């Protein structure tokens, strides 16, 4: 007999009935018992649930993740994992199925981050059409990033209550609908407001990716999965101006940057509706309990998670945890600062590159192509993942399955040094009126900028996740809020900075700031264990 997990009329997956019961007892047996009498039904259901309860110690030994509880193990109606090999548990899924989920959240991340930068291609056109200054039309980029930051706070805890799929699907749907509003906007302030909500609902892939990957992969597996995922949210902003500049210089006009983003979002919505399974373990158990209640007509079947659902409390707790970690935890403070600096540099570049390469007589489409170097660097950094994984695996094996969070920091040694080098390289080789310095020279530096960009991001994320574990979602939400809110504000100063300071010193200023970030990975590599030992919240090895 096949068991279909249903929620709101959608089929989430199918497993055989022996995933529900052991000892030869299944739902059909329960149904037959109901026909024979109440006593028989209770007997059958007890036998079925005892089979669930007896495997819990083994689940604990094997490291299968579930919520701890003070619930009495004699609670026969408490739904748990059936065994350590329960195919409903996402950690037991085949690797191909896990990667299908990773690809889908990567596509969502690409679509929403594409939307963060594609608008910058149309800022000049928006300014002319609505009769406002460049600074006012640039608010569309600013408020998107601010909305992106604030959206990270509620959606991470909501995904822990209602499941990952519901949050991904609903927020992407809202993001796509607000693209339609952007394409139809008749004045600048309508457009600015719509851009904020585009960012707000587009924040979920970056705020929830840590939870989704933790649902599916062990920490050592996450070593190669997270960099693979991270290439997409960084390639999105790179392709934004590349495609957007060609759209805006064509007969289509700036409105089509929103229509293109809407089409991309609609395609991904269809894909995830049909192919994305639920990965949150507690939510899957909720579906299992719901099925048993419907099938046996016994309302006593329940999960711990169902009893603890309180959206308001969860959001409040997540917000307070995020603020607390951001104020009191040196690891969160320093790596949030590092990520913020890197993002500020990246989004200022979206304003600065058009100014620099316009002096080389590039047209709008060619200016967009100047971002390809950053994209190449991001892809090359992702290609280094097998080397990094081999290193981590050796450490993991040598230490009998124990890894320190500080072991994650090695790639950042390279990234932290290469970041300022790439900035100074770009700053002092962009001579558009010098016959002996070709435009390709500063563009080559952007490859190393993209490389360091990805290293900083995925190493920081892995280090925070390993350091805070259960509170990692709150720590990452705090980092997301700060870096996007700060990037949004600083994106307004990018164009004036390049105009007033000039190409060389504007980029050099960013380089000097990145020099100040170099000590962070080295200091935490040396003192990280001691800092975690003094923390109330960090994981202590």
UniProtKB/Swiss-Prot annotation:
Membrane topology: Multi-pass membrane protein
Subcellular location(s) of the protein: Membrane
Cross-referenced PROSITE patterns: MFS
CDD domains, A to Z: MFS_Tpo1_MDR_like (cd17323)
Disulfide bonds: none
Keywords: Membrane, Transmembrane, Transmembrane helix, Transport
Record PANTHER family: MAJOR FACILITATOR SUPERFAMILY (PTHR23502), MAJOR FACILITATOR SUPERFAMILY (MFS) PROFILE DOMAIN-CONTAINING PROTEIN-RELATED (PTHR23502:SF47)
Family named by the database record: Belongs to the major facilitator superfamily. CAR1 family.
Entry protein name: Uncharacterized transporter C530.02
Lineage, opening ranks: Eukaryota, Fungi, Dikarya, Ascomycota, Taphrinomycotina
